[in-house]
A protein has these predicted regions:
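Juxtamembrane intracellular "pre-TM" segments in multi-pass secondary transporters
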Residues: 1-5, 183-217, 394-413
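Substrate-agnostic recognition of the 12-TM MFS/MFS-like secondary transporter fold
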Residues: 6-22, 46-58, 69, 74-75, ...
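A single, central transmembrane helix in multi-pass transporters
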Residues: 23-24, 158-165, 204-262, 361
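Transmembrane alpha-helix termini and helix-breaking/packing motifs in multi-pass membrane transporters
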Residues: 26-32, 86-88, 146-167, 239, ...
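C-terminal transmembrane bundle of multi-pass solute transporters/carriers
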Residues: 52-56, 71-77, 239-414, 426-434
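Helix-loop junctions at membrane interfaces in 12-TM secondary transporters
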Residues: 87-101, 291-303
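Helix-loop junctions on the cytosolic side of multi-pass membrane transporters
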Residues: 121-122, 169-193, 270, 380-392
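Symmetry-related core transmembrane helices of the 12-TM Major Facilitator Superfamily/SLC fold
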Residues: 162-180, 364-380
Length: 434
């Protein structure tokens, strides 16, 4: 699987920069302006474009005749915006800073779902690809653990400005690594009469394909709760007598999620839809327990357990998108799905701000209820209507890959996509092809 290691390094570096922006923006705004609210406005401008830019970015990626230039260019644009924020925030007029934040945030979908859409071209179908998505999911969780810690450490020993420069350097590394990935020649374009990705094709696929509709609606609902978890953790730790314990709780959750993605997320024998339901339901149960624990230590244990349960959810989501996204809308499905989750998390953060006066244990129970409701929603949507018919060729390819994996061989058959390409190989494909 040539290129997968470089892809994972690029994804980790890009997501490190993305995950660190929330804390870096707030710390830098507080340091230079004395107002955390100013940082919140800038962060909102950074996050808001994700869902709006997602279909545009996905369609542009699908139509690009030079995929290397497109992916490297979007990562470079993201990095440039981060670097500009390091120098402009708190110094330049607010409209200028907000404009830079909007431009940088518009590149965000390619850092998340856009990069994940490349895995299908790097790894042939079968257990190897499922495991690759597990590793890809671990880059999100690894970045979520390390980036805020690194930003806090640099800011504590220096200032928030160098911390944001560190994030820009990580983004530059991601762009450089992405430039070294093998990309397939996209070919002369679709044949006459063949489907072409329009701006609404990703949204149409998310609605029409039952499996995609189920996982997208459920994870979007679940992420309303996840977005509220950080503020709620701070409030909960304060009521338990540890005002600084919110960071401990969220670190426990992030470490648990990383552990879950590296262990439970690599289970390929369980259908991804079932794995997603189990993950959301178990996360809800663990958070319910966290609402009633009497100390920060026990609460951290419950948060870690919730993180372990949440870890496989992203892996399962990526597998479902890869297997059921129509070929012509694959990148849009990945970018739009990621954008919806970011928007849902932002909504959750805003809602918990409005409800901050409520007892924290009530807020934790509400977040847990959203996870359980998401699991029920997935069950209801997945059970509604006939299942999408699987393409015989794709099923046969996956069966051959599983047999070879059982025999200890990872070689690909003559019909498998190229494992050395970061984009899917050209040629006719059925909509169900992963």
């Amino acid at each position: 699987m040539p290129g997968l290691g470089r892809y994972l390094a690029a994804a980790l570096a890009a997501r490190f920069a993305s995950e660190g922006m929330g804390m870096a923006v707030v710390l830098l705004a507080l340091e230079r302006t004395g107002s955390a609210a100013h940082g919140a406005f800038v962060l909102t401008a950074w996050l808001a474009p994700h869902v709006l830019a997602a279909p545009l970015a996905g369609a542009a990626a699908a139509r690009s005749r030079r995929p290397r230039l497109f992916h490297v260019g979007t990562l470079a644009g993201f990095t440039t915006a981060v670097a500009a924020m390091a120098f402009l925030l708190g110094r330049a007029p607010t409209p200028v800073v907000l404009a830079v934040a909007v431009l940088g945030g518009s590149c965000g979908p390619m850092v998340t779902g856009g990069l994940s859409s490349l895995v299908a071209g790097l790894v042939p179908p079968g257990p190897a690809r499922d495991r690759a998505y597990g590793w890809d999911a671990s880059t999100y969780n690894g970045a979520a653990v390390t980036a805020p810690a690194a930003v806090s450490l640099v800011a504590a020993f220096g200032s928030a400005g160098p911390a944001m420069v560190l994030l820009a350097a990580s983004g530059a590394l991601a762009a450089a690594l992405a430039a070294t990935l093998p990309y397939a020649n996209p070919g002369p374009g679709p044949a006459p009469g063949a489907p072409r990705a329009g701006l609404g094709s990703g949204l149409a696929a998310l609605w029409r394909v039952r499996e995609l509709r189920a996982v997208t609606s459920a994870t979007t609902l679940a992420f309303v709760g996840i977005g509220a978890l950080t503020t709620t953790a701070v409030l909960l730790a304060t009521t338990l007598g540890s005002p600084g314990g919110g960071g401990v709780l969220m670190t426990a959750f992030a470490l648990g999620a990383l552990t879950g993605s590296l262990t439970l997320g690599r289970i390929t024998s369980v259908p991804p839809g079932r794995l997603a339901r189990w993950a959301m339901a178990a996360t809800g149960v663990a958070l319910t327990a966290a609402a009633f624990t009497p100390s920060v230590t026990l609460t951290a244990v419950a948060f870690a357990a919730a993180g372990v349960c949440d870890g496989p959810l992203l892996t399962a989501t990526l597998r479902i998108r890869s297997e059921f996204a129509p070929e012509e809308a694959r990148t849009q499905v990945f970018t739009l799905g990621a954008g919806l989750k970011v928007t849902a998390a932002s909504t959750g953060a805003a809602l918990v701000g409005l409800a901050a006066a409520a007892p924290p244990w009530i807020l934790v129970l509400a977040i847990a209820a959203l996870q359980l409701a998401a699991a029920l929603l997935h069950t209801a949507v997945a059970a509604h209507g006939p299942a999408r018919a699987a393409d015989p060729g794709r099923v046969a390819a996956r069966a051959r890959a599983r047999r070879r994996a059982a025999d200890g061989s990872l070689t690909t058959g003559p019909r498998a996509p190229s494992a050395g390409s970061a984009t899917t190989a050209p040629g006719p494909r059925t909509p169900e092809a992963p």
